[in-house]
Amino acid sequence: IGQTLVQLLSPFQCKINFFDVRNFQIDELDNFCLKNHIDIKNINQKSMNDVLVESDIISIHLPLNDETEDMINAEVLSKLKPSAVIVNTARGGIVAEEDLANFLRTHDDSFAAFDVFKEEPVINNNLFNLIS
């Protein structure tokens, strides 16, 4: 999914910083870029901390497991830019939803887009109270 997102964003010449637990070799990135007609100068593998601190948009593409449950929590959110956009189309449970609601309440320029939640169907969720 992350690679598809890169392909979709490439015509816009976006600077794409990504974090992956796997360290990609430069030739792997080069081959991916050549195959998909993407300028390799726009793609950078960085530490998770650097991605959080530097990015305008955080798009989450992770499996849900013991290591990733509530991975995006208050501590992680505190590293984001005040105007950060958070997109979660991966799995509910990766983002600590109450922590995100608190972050959004205190950062008027930020927003979040989700198509997954920890508990579905969604009956009562503090994130819905933030819709404006």
Predicted features and spans:
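Rossmann-like dinucleotide-binding domain for NAD(H)/NADP(H)
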Residues: 83-132
